[in-house]
From Swiss-Prot:
Zinc found in the keyword field: no
An example Gene Ontology CC term for this record: plasma membrane
Main location: membrane
Membrane-crossing residue ranges in chain numbering: 72-92, 104-124
Keywords for the protein's UniProt record, in alphabetical order: Cell membrane, Membrane, Transmembrane, Transmembrane helix
Membrane topology: Multi-pass membrane protein
Organism from which the protein derives: Bacillus subtilis (strain 168)
UniProt-recorded name of the protein: SPbeta prophage-derived uncharacterized protein YomK
Subcellular compartments: Cell membrane
C-alpha cells in the first residue's frame, strides 16, 4: 500500500536494500498505469520541504553507495591479485601449459570465468540500484522545485 505514512516511514527507516526494492515495486522500470503513477506522485507532493530534502539526501547517499564506479578500481585490483594467487595455488603458468598442468590450468580458467561473471552480475545489479535511487532523487528534486 502506497500512502504518505508508509512513504515517510520507508524513506526514513528502511535499509538501503529494502528501500531500493520498495522503489522498484512502486515505480517499476517498465512503467505503470498513468492514474496509479499520478496518485503516487501526488502523495510525494504532499511531503513537506524538509521531508523532501531529507529524502533527496538519503537517495544521493544510496546512489553513491551502489555506484560501481566508486568501487571498481579497488575491485579490479583485488580481482587481479586473486587471479595471480590462483595461478600460484594451482601451479599454473598460462603462457606455459604442459601435459602435467593442463587440468590445473582448466580449473584455474573455469574459476576465473566464474568469478568474472559473478563480479559482472554484481556490477550490473549495483548499477541498476544506483539508477533506481537516482530516479527517485530526481523526482523528489523536481517536486521540491515545483513547491518553491
Amino acid at each position: 500500500m502506497f500512502n504518505k505514512k508508509v512513504l515517510k516511514h520507508n524513506l526514513a527507516e528502511m535499509n538501503p536494500k529494502e528501500l531500493i526494492k520498495f522503489i522498484k515495486h512502486e515505480f517499476p522500470i517498465n512503467g505503470q498505469d498513468y492514474h496509479t503513477h499520478a496518485r503516487k506522485v501526488q502523495i510525494i507532493k504532499s511531503l513537506s520541504p524538509s521531508e523532501l530534502s531529507s529524502a533527496i539526501a538519503r537517495m544521493e547517499g544510496i546512489k553513491s553507495q551502489y555506484d560501481p564506479s566508486k568501487t571498481w578500481g579497488i575491485g579490479s585490483l583485488i580481482l587481479g591479485t586473486s587471479f595471480i594467487g590462483f595461478q600460484v595455488l594451482f601451479g599454473v603458468n598460462i603462457s606455459k601449459i604442459t601435459e602435467g598442468n593442463r587440468l590445473n590450468a582448466l580449473i584455474y580458467v573455469l574459476i576465473t570465468i566464474i568469478i568474472c561473471l559473478w563480479t559482472l552480475r554484481n556490477i550490473i545489479k549495483d548499477k541498476e540500484n544506483a539508477t533506481t535511487a537516482d530516479y527517485l532523487k530526481e523526482l523528489l528534486i523536481q517536486i521540491k522545485s515545483e513547491k518553491n
